[in-house]
Design a protein with these regions (language model features):
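Glycine/threonine-rich beta-strand-loop-alpha-helix active-site module
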Residues: 73-178
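N-terminal small/polar loop signature for handling phosphorylated ligands or for N-terminal nucleophile
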Residues: 41-114, 228-238
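Short glycine/serine/threonine-rich phosphate/pyrophosphate-binding segments
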Residues: 17-20, 42-45, 72-75, 98-102, ...
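An N-terminal, well-structured beta->alpha segment
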Residues: 1-63
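C-terminal charged capping/lid subdomain of soluble metabolic enzymes
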Residues: 298, 302, 308-381
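C-terminal catalytic subdomain
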Residues: 255-321, 327
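Carboxylate- and glycine-rich phosphate/diphosphate-binding segment that chelates Mg2+/Mn2+
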Residues: 149-255
C-alpha cells in the first residue's frame, strides 16, 4: 500500500500572497507567529506579508533568530518566543531554513514531551498535528511548504539530522513567484538545482511508484525548461521554478531521496555549505554512480532534460546523456561541480560515516557503502 500526503490547501501564481490573510480569517486564527530570517526582514521581503497582516488588523509577533542551516538553539529560542507570543498559528516566510524551524517549533508546541528536537530524528513518534502553519516560500528549491520533513543542525556534533513527521506538513502553502523575485542569481541557481535533485532522486529512489513518478518527471521537465530563465530573472522562469519545485516536493516528500542528500547534509554540517549548492555540486557524480541501478529511468530523465534523439540511444548513451544534461545545466547557471577548496581530506572518512547514517541514504537505488561515499567525495576534490 502506498500513502500520499499533501497540504490541505495550496495557492499558486503571481499575487497569491493575499491568500495568507484570507486563510487566517477563514480558519479563525487570533494571532500569527511570523517565522522568517533576518535577511528577509532587512530586504523588505517579509514586509510583503506583515504589511498585509497590518492592513487586515491581524495581530502577530515576528521571530527571526534563524540561521541558513537552522540549529538546535534556533529551535529552542523559537519555542520560547512562540510561548511568549501566545499565538495560535505560524506564518513561515522564507526558504527551507525558516520552514524547517517553523515545523520544529510547531511540533514541539503540540508534543511537549519531545522538547529536545534531537528526540525527533528519523521517523518521529509524535501523536499530535503541529501548530497550523501557513507556508510562504521565498526560494524555489526546498519545497518545504509541501513536505513532511525538516532538517536541523547539531553544531556541537557537526551533523545535520532529518526529522520525518506527517504531523508537520503545513496546512496551507502560498506559492507566489513574486515573493521569489528578490533572490540573487546565485541563490536562484543553488535552490533551483536543489529542486532538480529532489525530482531526480525522488524519481529513482527505492520507494518510487507510479504516482510519484508522474510528479517527478514533470518536475524535471519544468525545472529544465525554467531554471536558466529564473537565474536571468525572467517572469516566465520564476513562475516555472515556483511550480516545478513544488511539484518535485509533492513527490519526494512521499517516497524519499537518496545518497546525494545524505552527502549534502554532511557537507553543510561540516563546512556550513548552503544546502542547495551542496546538492548541486554532488548531483552529476552521484547520478553517474547510481546509473547502473536505475533501469530505463535515465532515458526519461534525458528526455525531460531536453536531450534530442533519446529513443535511438543505447542504455549507456542515454544514461551518459542524462548526466551530461544535468552537468551542463549546473554549469550554465554558475554551479561549480567540484569540492576543491571545500572538503578536507582529514574529514572525508568521518563525513562518509555520517552520510551513510543519514536518513536519506537507505532510499538510494544503488546499495551504498561508506567506502563508496568516500570515493564519491574524493572524486570531486
Amino acid at each position: 500500500m502506498n500513502k500520499f500526503m499533501l497540504n490541505e490547501t495550496s495557492y499558486h501564481g503571481a499575487g497569491a500572497i493575499t491568500a495568507v490573510v484570507d486563510e487566517i480569517k477563514a480558519r479563525g486564527f487570533a494571532k500569527a507567529f511570523v517565522a522568517t530570517d533576518p535577511d528577509l526582514i532587512k530586504f523588505g521581503v517579509a514586509a510583503k506579508v506583515t504589511d498585509l497582516l497590518d492592513a487586515a488588523a491581524i495581530p502577530y509577533a515576528v521571530f527571526s533568530d534563524i540561521k541558513p542551516n537552522p540549529t538546535i538553539e534556533n529551535v529552542q529560542n523559537g519555542v520560547a518566543a512562540f510561548k511568549a507570543a501566545e499565538a495560535d498559528c505560524i506564518v513561515a516566510i522564507g526558504g527551507g531554513s525558516s520552514m524547517d524551524t517553523a515545523k520544529a517549533i510547531g511540533i514541539i508546541m503540540t508534543n511537549p514531551e519531545f522538547a529536545d528536537v534531537r528526540s525527533l530524528e528519523g521517523v518521529a513518534p509524535t501523536k499530535n498535528p503541529c501548530v497550523p502553519i501557513i507556508a510562504v516560500p521565498t526560494t524555489a528549491g526546498t519545497a518545504a511548504e509541501v513536505t513532511i520533513n525538516y532538517v536541523i543542525t547539531d553544531v556541537e556534533k557537526k551533523r545535520k539530522f532529518v526529522c520525518v513527521d506527517a504531523h508537520d506538513i503545513p496546512v496551507v502553502a502560498v506559492v507566489d513567484p513574486d515573493m521569489m523575485a528578490s533572490m540573487p542569481a546565485s541563490l536562484t541557481a543553488a535552490t533551483g538545482m536543489d529542486a532538480l535533485t529532489h525530482a531526480i532522486e525522488g524519481y529513482i529512489t527505492k520507494g518510487a511508484w507510479a504516482l510519484s513518478d508522474m510528479f517527478h518527471i514533470e518536475a524535471i521537465r519544468i525545472i529544465a525548461a525554467s531554471l536558466r530563465g529564473a537565474v536571468a530573472n525572467t517572469p516566465e522562469g520564476r513562475e516555472g521554478m515556483a511550480l516545478g519545485q513544488y511539484v518535485a516536493g509533492m513527490g519526494f516528500s512521499n517516497v524519499g531521496l537518496g545518497v546525494d542528500h545524505s552527502m549534502a547534509h554532511t557537507l553543510s554540517a561540516y563546512y556550513d555549505m548552503p544546502h542547495g549548492k551542496a546538492c548541486a555540486t554532488l548531483l552529476p557524480a552521484v547520478m553517474a554512480y547510481n546509473a547502473e541501478a536505475t533501469g530505463e529511468k535515465y532515458r526519461e530523465i534525458a528526455r525531460a532534460m531536453g536531450v534530442q534523439g533519446v529513443d535511438s540511444m543505447t542504455q549507456a548513451e542515454y544514461r551518459a546523456a542524462a548526466v551530461e544534461a544535468v552537468r551542463q545545466l549546473a554549469e550554465d547557471v554558475g554551479i561549480v561541480t567540484s569540492l576543491k577548496g571545500v572538503a578536507r581530506e582529514e574529514d572525508i572518512h568521518q563525513m562518509s560515516v555520517d552520510a551513510y547514517n543519514d536518513a536519506c541514504r537507505p532510499g538510494n537505488p544503488r546499495e551504498t557503502s561508506v567506502e563508496d561515499i568516500e570515493a564519491l567525495y574524493r572524486s570531486l576534490m
